[in-house]
């Protein structure tokens, strides 16, 4: 209403609008945090399954050297206080790993048309990362829109579905292998 009638400004409207923006950013942060944890779990599980749980496997074979150097530097600068190396990845690193090891991740992390390619299939992670940057800086004058929040929630739901489908198919495969 205010967009069509700029003079509309009843008492308390400004405070209400600010609270709504804060709520949207707060909800978006929760969604993004869950997406990041899901990505971390999925990427690390897949790398360790494919290359082995030792650093000589998943870390060396599964993670591109440029990411290893960046993450390793942070690990060393932080004296490993956050835990092992995997606790030093950024959200966007998971996209780079997925693109680098596309054959492992295309069925798990790609959204959109089948066969659309690495860049398009993982572009949703760029969106999530850009929104993460906005809400991570409390001093930012930018708030996420309801539309942004809904898109983040949609990505979270799709990721959860794909990861659940992967778990189901892995369970079925291991059940068949055990017979």
Question: How would you name each of these model-derived features?
Answer:
Residues 1-179:
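Amphipathic alpha-helical interface elements
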């Amino acid at each position: 209403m205010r967009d069509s009638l700029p003079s509309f400004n009843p008492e308390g409207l400004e405070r209400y609008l600010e609270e709504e923006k804060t709520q949207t950013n707060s909800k978006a942060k929760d969604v993004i945090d869950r997406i990041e944890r899901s990505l971390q779990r999925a990427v690390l599980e897949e790398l360790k399954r494919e290359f082995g749980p030792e650093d000589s496997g998943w870390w060396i074979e599964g993670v591109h050297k440029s990411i290893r150097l960046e993450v390793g530097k942070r690990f060393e600068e932080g004296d490993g206080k956050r835990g092992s190396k995997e606790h030093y990845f950024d959200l966007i690193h998971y996209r780079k790993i997925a693109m680098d090891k596309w054959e492992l991740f295309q069925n798990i992390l790609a959204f959109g048309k089948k066969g659309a390619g690495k860049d398009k299939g993982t572009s949703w992670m760029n969106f999530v990362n850009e929104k993460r940057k906005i809400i991570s800086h409390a001093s930012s004058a930018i708030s996420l829109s309801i539309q942004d929040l809904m898109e983040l929630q949609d990505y979270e739901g799709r990721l959860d579905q794909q990861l659940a489908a992967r778990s189901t198919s892995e369970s079925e495969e291991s059940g068949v292998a055990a017979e």
